[in-house]
Amino acid sequence: MEEIIKPVSKELLKAELTEDRRLRMTNKSNNQIYIITHQNAPNVMREIGRLREIAFRAAGGGTGLSMDIDEYDTMEHPYKQLIVWNPEAEEILGGYRYLLGTDVRFDEAGAPILATSHMFHFSDAFIKEYLPQTIELGRSFVTLEYQSTRAGSKGLFALDNLWDGLGALTVVMPNVKYFFGKVTMYPSYHRRGRDMILYFLKKHFNDREELVTPMEPLILETSDEELRTLFCKDTFKEDYKILNTEIRKLGYNIPPLVNAYMSLSPTMRMFGTAINYEFGDVEETGILIAVDEILEDKRIRHIQTFIESHPDALKMPCESEGVFTPKVVTPQEGCCH
């Protein structure tokens, strides 16, 4: 396990966080969203790598290297880094990395070069019909000091701030129809609790088209019969109550991102779970969320607010009319919002 690098100078960070790289202000806490790459902001990238490694190690994952920066961050056409910057404290409080489907390159075998390609197989239907309109998200993190269990009020809106950034992306890139990402669970999480969560997700969000499948699917340790007996209700709400109660009995909580993604859209697709052997053996569950099926309150909070404050963002030489009109979507009652 390598020693993590020292913090990058705030002056170096501020010099690279220029106005042309600023996307928006957040709805809460008056923080700023920036988009950078390794090439145009190498010092910010080093600080992101440092903060990611600290956060992931604390949760039981990480690379074990001095900072979490890989070839997908540094390649010729790299993943972009979306970060939340606290201008008052002059520090990064969280981030995602992302790649537009239209920017994806393919290897000699015709497989997409994605950070998840070593864990998941992407069907021809996904590559042709979904990928060109998809943003792949990864490496989501909240800096340790801003995680709500440690930070109190200042960490309360960290994840909310990040989603303000993702909401803005759907405005400035109106061809984007889907977010493809992963829910990460760590080996330290209770095994039976993990099995209950994954069974619940499969029951209510399973992708029957097999658009994306894990190359080595995770095998649950709890019997299918036991889980089927436990989650025997007809509705999401009733099964969710069971899940929440059983997880609490174990002395755990449902991971915040699991709750957060379920509360974004009732039509989320779950693609199964694979072990990421390159990242501390964490367990990665693939998911897909359709932008126009995000629940209205979330759409207004993270997308509509950006449109109202940045009307020029819609004045672009592509058809954006109707892009933000969501389908009629009924919330999953009983989920944590």
Swiss-Prot record:
<keyword id="KW-0443">Lipid metabolism</keyword>
<keyword id="KW-0444">Lipid biosynthesis</keyword>
<comment type="pathway">
    <text>Lipid metabolism.</text>
</comment>
<dbReference type="GO" id="GO:0016746">
    <property type="term" value="F:acyltransferase activity"/>
</dbReference>
<keyword id="KW-0012">Acyltransferase</keyword>
<protein>
    <recommendedName>
        <fullName>Glycine N(alpha)-acyltransferase</fullName>
        <ecNumber>2.3.2.-</ecNumber>
    </recommendedName>
</protein>
<dbReference type="GO" id="GO:0006629">
    <property type="term" value="P:lipid metabolic process"/>
</dbReference>
<comment type="function">
    <text>Is involved in the production of glycine lipids (GL), which are phosphorus-free membrane lipids important for fitness during growth of the human gut bacterium B.thetaiotaomicron in vivo and in vitro. Catalyzes the first step of GL biosynthesis, i.e. the N-acylation of glycine via addition of a 3-hydroxy fatty acyl group, to form a range of monoacylated glycine (also named lyso-glycine lipids or lyso-GL). Is important for the ability of B.thetaiotaomicron to adapt to stress and colonize the mammalian gut.</text>
</comment>
<keyword id="KW-0808">Transferase</keyword>
<comment type="similarity">
    <text>Belongs to the acetyltransferase family.</text>
</comment>
<dbReference type="InterPro" id="IPR016181">
    <property type="entry name" value="Acyl_CoA_acyltransferase"/>
</dbReference>
<dbReference type="Pfam" id="PF13444">
    <property type="entry name" value="Acetyltransf_5"/>
</dbReference>
<dbReference type="InterPro" id="IPR052351">
    <property type="entry name" value="Ornithine_N-alpha-AT"/>
</dbReference>
